[in-house]
Swiss-Prot record:
GO terms for cellular component: cytoplasm; excinuclease repair complex. It comes from Xanthomonas oryzae pv. oryzae (strain KACC10331 / KXO85). Belongs to the UvrC family. This is UvrABC system protein C. Interacts with UvrB in an incision complex.
């Protein structure tokens, strides 16, 4: 008999309250790992199909058994859902999309970042440095765009190998679709201006570009440069006839769309963002309220606080008027150094954006309230299992991660009765211990976290979970005793038989062991917190280890001091960009000659290092 989904997530109930509109759905595991992103022509029907009957294959069964929650984003059409799905898959890399989807990638328009940039169709990994515009739903749209770009701005399309070896202009120049930079038929400043205009067009700023061209045409006419004025007139005519404002092609201007939904003293603010003409998807926030705040007050406070830390676009759409609009506009404009407009009475396409955001805010809030109810039940079960008199308001969990003692990192995650409090997560880079000594690492992390709490009279957890057995728990006990910390309930979470989930042993500070079993809501809560601490520790460890290894590679290269190392990293935007560069690109960095570039390239790719004479070392 096939096994159905084993998580506590009620997929049928979730699907039943969804809209029949098109959209994108996201499946998450208990530790917030993104499992899958999919699109739907009708969300209720598509999501419900996963939970009606037996999964079609073992991989789908495995995926569904891990689902702890789902999020959805409503769109206006299935085409929009398709594009948003692709963007989320590319940016978030869900675990199961790699195998469950066709790996064919959508096409983009690529504008390279070179002295003489080229424009071309691109599929696959973004290995080439430059800007990528899209995605497009098909190759036809890209080719039409490229044809227009060559006609309007005369940018080159040839590969570098062809560009570097030409002695006379190609056919593209002869038919007026390239300005001939390969043989110096266009000045560098003029070509750069064409690139700037092309970028504006691809960013969806065709109105602004049209105004610029109109002004240039008038100036040329006044200067009696009639031939140039005629060229600009033709350019403006072609631009206006080919302007495309289709939502699915990402031609929307840069803007944010905000909607606020409230229910049962809870609030959800949903942010829908567009940047460079691309729909970046939605993000949900759940601000804490006093239960009496109105939706417009909540939204107004959110706008002020959120954009104090994030650069605002020029236009922000709101689903309602907020208090002190003019004051907030002035403050945002001053901070951003450009005009910021807050709008709520809008029509046409922008009204559609507001409707999308409003529907998604309402749906997200309903989902959150359902999730919070389950979380409260698990928290209450934990209180009962531990025999605590008061509700469990705060739980912290520590975990250690390293690779054979290298780059040891400790994590501390925080949960309250409503779930994770990610803003209070902490990582500790462990040092000064014997590599691989988990006991010493745990003690150092506990001491650092609670010493600060003691010195600053900070908040303490009701329950402190330690990922480990009696030895780890003893280190935590000793550290708290040395600091004089009391009234914190300590629990060690030891792995069960064969490390199977649901078989964990809970070790109390007095030595007692509890084995509540897989069906226990209290253990499920502990597993959720422990798994989140594990994920957070591993992520920090991997980042620290990678940084140490890559940085040491640069430090080991003769001729690379701190200044050159900083120049290289700044030029390529980090180690990943540097590793993707070729020798010729590396040699363009100030202070790096061809020989040094060759040594850098060889070192980063594990090749034999050339010596000073240009010969490879053994």
């Amino acid at each position: 008999m096939s096994a159905g989904p084993q998580s506590d997530f009620d997929g049928k109930a979730f699907a039943a309250q969804l809209s029949t509109a098109p959209g994108v759905y996201r499946m998450y595991a208990g530790d917030d790992t993104l499992l899958y992103v999919g699109k739907a022509g009708a969300l209720r029907k598509r999501v419900g199909s996963y939970f009606n009957g037996t999964p079609k294959n073992a991989r789908l069964t495995s995926m569904l058994s891990q689902v702890a929650r789902m999020d959805v984003t409503v769109t206006r059409s299935e085409a929009e859902a398709l594009l948003l799905e692709n963007q989320l898959i590319k940016s978030l890399s869900p675990r199961y999309n790699v195998s469950l989807r066709d790996d064919k990638s959508y096409p983009y328009v690529l504008l390279t970042r070179e002295h003489w940039p080229r424009i071309a169709l691109h599929r696959g990994p973004r290995a080439v440095q430059g800007r990528y515009f899209g995605p497009y739903t098909g190759v036809t749209g890209v080719r039409e765009t490229l044809s227009l770009m060559h006609k309007l701005f005369k940018l080159r399309s040839c590969e570098d190998s062809v560009f570097r070896n030409r002695s006379r202009p190609c056919l593209q120049y002869q038919i007026g679709r390239c300005s001939g930079p390969c043989v110096d038929l266009v000045a560098a400043p003029d070509y750069a201006e064409s690139v700037r205009r092309a970028t504006m067009f691809l960013e969806g700023k065709s109105d602004q570009l049209g105004e610029e061209i109109m002004q240039s045409m008038q100036q040329a006419s006044e200067a009696l440069e009639f031939e140039r004025a005629a060229r600009l007139r033709d350019l403006l005519s072609s631009l206006r006839s080919m302007q495309n404002r289709q939502y699915v092609d990402g031609r929307a201007a840069d803007l944010d769309v905000l909607a606020c939904a409230t229910q049962s003293s809870q609030a959800c603010v949903l942010l829908l963002s567009f940047r460079d003409g691309r729909n970046l998807g939605t993000r949900s926030f759940f601000p804490k309220t006093n239960g009496e705040d109105s939706a417009d007050e909540i939204l107004g406070a959110f706008v002020s606080q959120y954009y104090a830390e994030h650069s605002p676009p020029r236009e922000i759409l709101l689903d309602r008027e907020i208090p002190e609009t003019e004051l907030i506009e002035a403050a945002l404009s001053t901070a951003a150094e450009h005009k910021v407009a807050l709008k709520w009475n809008v029509r046409g396409e922008r009204a559609g954006y507001l409707l999308l955001a409003t529907r998604n805010a309402q749906l997200t809030l309903v989902t959150e309230l359902t999730s919070q109810s389950a979380q409260h039940a698990r928290s209450e079960a934990l209180r009962e299992m531990l025999g605590l008199a008061e509700p469990v308001k705060r739980v912290e969990c520590f975990d250690i991660s390293h690779t054979m003692g290298e780059a040891t990192v400790a994590s501390c995650v925080v949960f309250d009765a409503s779930g994770p409090v990610r803003g209070q997560y902490r990582r500790f880079n462990i040092s000064g211990i014997t590599p691989g000594d988990d006991y010493a690492a745990m003690r150092q992390a506990i001491e650092r976290r609670f010493r600060r709490a003691v010195e600053e009279n900070g908040v303490l957890p009701d329950v402190l979970l330690i990922d480990g057995g009696a030895g780890q728990l003893a280190q935590a006990q000793a550290a708290l005793a040395d600091l004089g910390v009391e009234n914190v309930w300590l629990v060690g979470v030891a792995k069960g038989e064969e490390r199977r989930a649901g078989h964990e042993a809970l070790i109390m500070a007095d030595g007692r062991e509890l084995r509540p079993g897989a069906a226990s809501p209290a253990l499920q809560f502990i597993q959720q917190v422990r798994d989140e601490a594990h994920r957070f520790a591993i992520t920090g460890h991997r980042g620290r280890r990678q940084k140490a290894r890559m940085t040491s590679k640069l430090e080991d290269i003769p001729g690379i001091g701190p200044r050159r190392r900083a120049s290289l990293l700044k030029h390529f935007g980090g180690l990943v960009g540097l590793k993707a560069a070729g020798e010729a690109e590396i040699a363009r960095v100030e202070g790096v000659n061809a020989a040094l570039a060759a040594r850098i390239y060889a070192n980063l790719h594990g090749l034999a290092l050339p010596d000073a004479a240009g010969e490879s070392s053994p």
